[in-house]
C-alpha cells in the first residue's frame, strides 16, 4: 500500500483480514494510510456504494461471499482517501450481477474525481468503463488511446475478441 503517495491498491484475491469484522477491516484502511480524525465522512462515502458493508459491519469478513469481500477490499482502500485507486482483476471469479454493481461503483467514484487504474481481463467491460486504455502483450504496450476508439478498432476487436466488428456486437 503506497498510501503516502496517495496510491492504494486492491490486489487480485481481495485479501481481507478474514478473522476481523467488516468494520475492523474498514478501519484498517484508515490506519494503514495514516488517516486521523473521525471516520464518519469516510463511511458515508463507502456505505452508499456498498450498502451490504453497513448491513454486515459486525460479520466476520472471512464469511462474506467473494463479491462482498471485493466490496470490502475496495471500501477499505477508500477509507485511506486515495488519490489513485489501483485494482487488479476485480471481476475475476465473480457473478455477473456483482461485477455490474462493482463497476457501477467504480464509474461513480471516477465521476467524483478519483483516478482509477484498472487491470482487467474482461476487456469488453474494461473498455466500456474506462476513459483511456492500453493493451499489453508480454508486458509491452501494443495499443493505447481513448477506450472508445480501441473498442471500435476492428484490428483490436478481431485480435482480442475474435471478430472484425467492434465490441457492441
Predicted feature residues:
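Glycine-rich phosphate-binding loops of nucleotide-dependent enzymes
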Residues: 1-169
Amino acid at each position: 500500500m503506497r498510501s503516502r503517495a496517495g496510491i492504494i491498491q486492491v490486489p487480485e484475491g481481495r485479501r481481507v483480514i478474514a478473522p476481523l469484522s467488516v468494520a475492523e477491516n474498514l478501519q484498517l484502511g484508515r490506519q494503514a494510510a495514516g488517516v486521523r480524525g473521525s471516520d464518519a465522512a469516510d463511511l458515508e462515502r463507502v456505505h452508499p456504494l456498498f450498502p451490504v458493508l453497513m448491513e454486515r459491519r459486525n460479520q466476520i469478513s472471512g464469511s462474506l461471499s467473494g463479491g462482498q469481500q471485493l466490496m470490502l477490499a475496495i471500501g477499505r482502500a477508500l477509507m485511506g482517501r486515495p488519490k489513485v485507486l489501483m485494482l487488479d482483476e476485480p471481476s475475476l471469479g465473480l457473478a455477473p450481477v456483482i461485477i455490474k454493481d462493482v463497476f457501477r461503483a467504480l464509474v461513480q467514484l471516477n465521476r467524483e474525481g478519483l483516478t482509477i487504474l484498472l487491470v482487467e481481463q474482461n476487456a469488453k467491460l474494461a473498455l466500456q468503463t474506462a476513459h483511456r486504455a492500453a493493451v499489453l502483450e508480454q508486458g509491452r504496450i501494443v495499443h493505447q488511446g481513448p477506450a472508445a476508439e480501441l473498442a471500435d478498432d476492428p484490428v483490436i476487436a478481431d485480435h482480442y475478441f475474435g471478430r472484425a466488428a467492434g465490441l457492441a456486437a
